[in-house]
Amino acid sequence: MKANDIRDLSTTEIQDQEKALKEELFNLRFQLATGQLENTARIREVRKAIARMKTIVRERELA
């Protein structure tokens, strides 16, 4: 998800999306450990999306 798309969401929606991505990251890491993960790049994408969301929430707190 792009940063501009995230900025269009409300803070609670961002936090809900972040929670869902954290669950997905957990599942991806579990799949990686068991050797079932095919697309290892997805872990990086999810981590970066979580970071973008946290950054935007923090920007709103400071504004």
Swiss-Prot record:
Entry-linked CDD domains: Ribosomal_L29_HIP
InterPro entries assigned: Ribosomal_protein_uL29, Ribosomal_uL29, Ribosomal_uL29_CS, Ribosomal_uL29_sf
Molecular function as annotated in GO: structural constituent of ribosome
Listed GO biological process terms: translation
Assigned GO CC terms: cytosolic large ribosomal subunit
Gene3D superfamilies in the cross-refs: 1.10.287.310
Protein keywords: Ribonucleoprotein, Ribosomal protein
Family the entry assigns: Belongs to the universal ribosomal protein uL29 family.
HAMAP family on file: Ribosomal_uL29
Name used for this protein in its record: Large ribosomal subunit protein uL29
Encoding gene per record: rpmC
